[in-house]
């Protein structure tokens, strides 16, 4: 973990209220798929950092890409960043996805919902680099909310589900996966809790990893704001920011 400043290379709105923020800094060297950064807004009245998932990184170039949706004052503040600006960053944080499994999987299904789609990109890139056959399933409310379909096709097959049917399959991600003829060797998923519950229920026998989206305050496990009950004893809890955000599906009670 490192508190540092990163410099803005570029920022672009790539979907409705969804921004692609490209940063450069030394902390990129320590990043792994599924981790996140805690960004500090520039406004003095916004005291809490905001957690943003790492979409991708290039350790040679020392750059990373964050995708986020403007939902409040903090992310609205980030959306005003431009080339050359600096931002106070804490990270990379959390335990990411396990991609070095034994035996190595031959097929992987990566399921993302909304702003849970970004961490699937780097994960898919690294799995594909290991020779794994990758399938992405991305869920959005509408076509105007969708992003990174073209980028993901470089590493696997991409399926889209939209609630209003304006792009891809009408419905939810599970309306896509229920038609797949075979189950994958491993599943990775990130998105809203209801989606993760549906994914977990749909593939009870498949090794599944879930990246949980919880509101965070500190990002380092000190404040207990982002807890999740353990599956084997719901009176005990994981700290999502420190113990996760990625967990085996059988570890957590959603």
UniProtKB/Swiss-Prot annotation:
Pathway where this protein functions: Pyrimidine metabolism; UMP biosynthesis via de novo pathway; orotate from (S)-dihydroorotate (NAD(+) route): step 1/1
Matches recorded under InterPro entries: Cyt_c3_hydrogenase_gsu, Dihydroorotate_DH_ele_sf, Dihydroorotate_DH_Fe-S-bd, Dihydroorotate_DHASE_ETsu, FAD-bd_FR_type, FNR_nucleotide-bd, OxRdtase_FAD/NAD-bd, PyrK_electron_transfer
SUPFAM superfamilies: Ferredoxin reductase-like, C-terminal NADP-linked domain, Riboflavin synthase domain-like
Binding sites annotated in the UniProt record for FAD: 50-53, 67-69, 74-75
One GO biological process term: 'de novo' UMP biosynthetic process
Ranges of residues in domain FAD-binding FR-type: 1-99
Residues reported in the UniProt entry to bind [2Fe-2S] cluster: 218, 223, 226, 241
Subunit structure comment from the entry: Heterotetramer of 2 PyrK and 2 PyrD type B subunits.
Function: Responsible for channeling the electrons from the oxidation of dihydroorotate from the FMN redox center in the PyrD type B subunit to the ultimate electron acceptor NAD(+).
NCBIfam families reported in the protein's UniProt record: PRK00054.1-2 (NF000797), PRK00054.1-4 (NF000799)
Protein's UniProt name: Dihydroorotate dehydrogenase B (NAD(+)), electron transfer subunit
Species of provenance: Listeria monocytogenes serotype 4a (strain HCC23)
């Amino acid at each position: 973990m490192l508190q540092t400043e990163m410099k803005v290379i570029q920022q672009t709105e790539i979907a409705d209220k969804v921004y692609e923020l490209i940063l450069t800094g030394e902390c990129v060297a320590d990043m792994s798929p599924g981790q996140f950064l805690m960004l500090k807004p520039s406004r003095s009245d916004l005291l809490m950092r905001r957690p943003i998932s790492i979409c991708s990184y290039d350790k040679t170039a020392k750059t990373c890409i964050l995708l986020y949706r403007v939902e409040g004052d903090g992310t609205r503040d980030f959306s005003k960043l431009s080339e050359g600006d600096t931002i106070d960053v804490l990270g990379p944080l959390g335990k990411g996805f396990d991609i070095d499994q034994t035996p190595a999987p031959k097929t992987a299904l990566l399921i993302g919902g909304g702003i849970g789609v970004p961490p699937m990109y780097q994960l898919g890139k690294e799995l594909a680099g290991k020779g794994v056959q990758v399938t992405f399933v991305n869920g959005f409310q509408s076509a105007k909310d969708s992003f990174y379909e073209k980028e993901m096709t470089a590493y696997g097959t991409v399926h889209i589900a939209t609630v209003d049917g304006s792009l891809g399959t009408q419905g939810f991600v599970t309306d896509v996966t229920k038609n797949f003829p075979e189950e994958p060797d491993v599943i990775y998923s990130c998105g809203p809790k209801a989606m993760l519950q549906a994914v977990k229920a749909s593939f009870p026998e498949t090794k599944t990893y879930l990246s949980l989206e919880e509101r965070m305050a500190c990002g380092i496990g000190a404040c207990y704001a982002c807890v999740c009950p353990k599956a084997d004893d719901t009176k005990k809890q994981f700290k999502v920011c420190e113990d996760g955000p990625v967990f085996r599906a059988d570890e957590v009670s959603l």
